Amino acid sequence: MSEEFDESEIIFSDNYFPIRRREDGNEKENNRPVDFRENSERVWNKSSRRSKTTPLPSAVTAFSSSLPVNIPMRRYSTEEEYSDDDGGRKMIPPHLIVGRRMEGGQMAFSVCTGNGRTLKGRDLSRVRNSVLKLTGFLEA
């Protein structure tokens, strides 16, 4: 690479680089972007020769080829499409569900074996076996 660029020149550039066409037939150099510094030097050299009242020549305007084309209008929908159909049931908050299960003895504490204890040895293998049985990987 003969010339180094700053990151701001590449990523945050305010200019579009038009494609330079050459007549020599070299395909790699045919579609090479025009360098920003070359453009600015050409404009600066031309403008330095002219008087300050003469306007600068307008740069070749190029537009992005990735602009979206023929975007359909968004179809606005009614609330009926987004409504949740819960069958008329009333929602019960999760903390009430947990409280009811703890009172009735239905709450499962498969990994909670005590305060501050970690699962080791026989306790760990029991938990592992119960999980494998519940998931169907181990038959009872």
Swiss-Prot record:
<dbReference type="GO" id="GO:0009646">
    <property type="term" value="P:response to absence of light"/>
</dbReference>
<protein>
    <recommendedName>
        <fullName>Protein S40-1</fullName>
    </recommendedName>
</protein>
<dbReference type="GO" id="GO:0009617">
    <property type="term" value="P:response to bacterium"/>
</dbReference>
<keyword id="KW-0963">Cytoplasm</keyword>
<feature type="compositionally biased region" description="Basic and acidic residues">
    <location>
        <begin position="20"/>
        <end position="44"/>
    </location>
</feature>
<dbReference type="Pfam" id="PF04520">
    <property type="entry name" value="Senescence_reg"/>
</dbReference>
<dbReference type="GO" id="GO:0010150">
    <property type="term" value="P:leaf senescence"/>
</dbReference>
<dbReference type="InterPro" id="IPR007608">
    <property type="entry name" value="Senescence_reg_S40"/>
</dbReference>
<dbReference type="GO" id="GO:0005737">
    <property type="term" value="C:cytoplasm"/>
</dbReference>
<comment type="similarity">
    <text>Belongs to the senescence regulator S40 family.</text>
</comment>
<feature type="region of interest" description="Disordered">
    <location>
        <begin position="16"/>
        <end position="58"/>
    </location>
</feature>
